[in-house]
């Protein structure tokens, strides 16, 4: 399976990443099949080869979570609602409804 992942490079404590397509069993800094972009987390600079990325995604390449976030910001993928976000929202809604019930109960008892 082909994965889209970040390949680390740069100086110590001044890292940058290349967005690469590679085999899922290869090492993080191993030889990639293709370089598809660049990301610098310090300056927030992002460069993406959109044609090559669309081709790889069309072939069934699976992006990692970090790469998916970059692609969503770049407009290549639709924003996906992750289960943790949904569970967090549901939990917040339950807490809000419980507070409303407690407030209503305390008002009626006074």
Swiss-Prot record:
SUPFAM superfamilies documented for this protein: Ribosomal protein S16 (SSF54565)
Alphabetical keyword list: Ribonucleoprotein, Ribosomal protein
GO cellular component, one term: cytoplasm
Keyword Ribosomal protein among UniProt keywords: yes
Region described as Disordered: 81-110
HAMAP family, per the entry: Ribosomal_bS16 (MF_00385)
Protein's name according to its UniProt entry: Small ribosomal subunit protein bS16
Organism expressing this protein natively: Prochlorococcus marinus (strain NATL2A)
Gene that encodes it: rpsP
């Amino acid at each position: 399976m082909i994965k889209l992942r970040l390949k680390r490079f740069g100086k110590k404590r001044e890292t940058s990443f290349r967005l690469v397509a590679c085999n899922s069993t290869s090492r993080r800094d191993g030889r990639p099949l293709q370089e598809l972009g660049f990301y610098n987390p310090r300056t927030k600079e992002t460069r993406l080869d959109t044609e090559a990325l669309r081709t790889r995604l069309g072939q069934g390449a699976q992006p990692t979570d970090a790469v998916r976030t970059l692609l969503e910001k770049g407009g290549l993928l639709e924003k996906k609602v992750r289960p943790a976000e949904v569970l967090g929202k549901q939990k917040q809604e339950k807490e809000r409804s419980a507070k409303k019930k407690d407030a209503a109960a305390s008002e009626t008892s006074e």
